[in-house]
Regions:
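Catalytic-domain carbohydrate-binding cleft regions of carbohydrate-active enzymes
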Residues: 1-154, 159-160
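Accessory, solvent-exposed terminal regions and/or long lumenal/extracellular loops of proteins
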Residues: 152-230
Length: 230
């Protein structure tokens, strides 16, 4: 948390950083205590590598996050929202209060308990439909509650089947560049889906009038997937 003990538990710090990567703002600052250092390189090599991966994942997700942030600006619907916003008729949406939607297509079920034998146990409610589990690469059937296990470098992230996720590739080094390559990740499982990518110069208030939107449509017919960008 922001204020408390005068030492940092590496496992807890990693889980906080994972949570931060799927929050509107990722920051690692806290109360000012001499010797309370939080830079990724002050931890063990294993933990430093995990923290580096978390930050890079956040960088990779920026095209999706920035688009969803613009939608929040336009509609007032938060980037992070409780499950009952999207599933108001389902009781589990109220019961599983830790879970939340991160934009329209990503669901997060934070790891909030310490590891046992190298894994954290998380009970996850998956709404109806199919969901892609980021950590395992598996497609899971929704409409049920599952018990899943996550190592320290894994986090409970689920993506709707059929979603189109625009992301930067792994070569992105900072967010100041204007010509970063955007990769479109299409999650299998639906016959068709859409996403409208939002872009502006990211520097000033010109976003109010000067911006670009790109419509992306995916269509699956049998084993053939067609992606249309317009």
């Amino acid at each position: 948390g922001h204020q408390g003990v005068d030492h940092i538990d590496p496992e807890l710090y990693v889980r906080w950083m994972q949570f931060g990567a799927f929050s509107p703002i990722l920051r690692s600052h806290s109360t000012k205590i001499a010797g309370l250092t939080k830079e990724p390189w002050v931890f063990s090599n294993e933990v430093s590598d995990i923290l580096r991966g978390i930050i890079r994942q956040r960088y990779n997700m920026v095209p999706y996050i920035y688009t969803m942030a613009r939608e929040a600006y336009e509609t007032g619907l938060s980037l992070c929202r409780p499950m009952y916003y999207d599933y108001p008729e389902t009781q589990e949406a109220y019961d599983y209060r830790n879970q939340y939607m991160f934009g329209n297509d990503v669901m997060v079920a934070p790891a909030t308990s310490p590891m046992k034998d190298g894994y954290t146990e998380v009970k996850v409610w998956l709404p109806e439909g199919q969901w892609y589990e980021f950590a395992s690469g598996k497609t899971l059937q929704g409409g049920q509650v599952l018990t899943r296990y996550f190592a320290l470098d894994e986090y409970p992230i689920y993506i709707k089947a059929g979603a189109v996720l625009p992301m930067y590739n792994d070569k992105v080094m900072n967010l100041n560049g204007k010509d970063e390559t955007i990769v479109l990740n299409v999650i299998p499982g639906k016959t068709s889906s859409e996403f409208t990518l939002y872009e502006d110069n990211g520097d000033d208030k010109n976003y109010q009038k000067e911006f670009a939107t790109t419509a992306i449509h995916s269509e699956k017919t049998g084993s053939k997937l067609t992606l249309t960008i317009s």
